[in-house]
């Protein structure tokens, strides 16, 4: 292992210390290593041609004009990526969908971009995991 020095502004350091305490890290180095591993795994997983898994989560307004129909159409267009989908009614206006995806990470990223870009979709997030086999 090598020792490196980094410079962080006060707010970022405070956030790191808070995260470290909440997650039970013994020191900042452990927290930074874990964060870095996660970021690098995301970067690797999102490369086109890489096979992997992903979880796409998003909130959308179900009564927004034609949005539900457009989302279903997008999902059917990418049916080969979908492993499972969970649909939750979070309020009178909003729904939460969580899709478990498997396949080429470039295709998954394209699908996620299509969904998240729809007008009426909020809080879209894609979490990628490389297939290590």
Curated annotation (Swiss-Prot):
The keyword Signal does not apply. HAMAP family: NikR (MF_00476). GO terms for biological process: response to nickel cation. This is Nickel-responsive regulator. Homotetramer. Binds 1 nickel ion per subunit. Ni(2+) binds at residues 76, 87, 89, 95. It comes from Enterobacter sp. (strain 638). GO terms for molecular function: DNA-binding transcription factor activity; nickel cation binding; sequence-specific DNA binding. Belongs to the transcriptional regulatory CopG/NikR family. Keywords: DNA-binding, Metal-binding, Nickel, Repressor, Transcription, Transcription regulation. The gene is nikR. Its cofactor is Ni(2+). SUPFAM superfamilies: ACT-like, Ribbon-helix-helix. Transcriptional repressor of the nikABCDE operon. Is active in the presence of excessive concentrations of intracellular nickel.
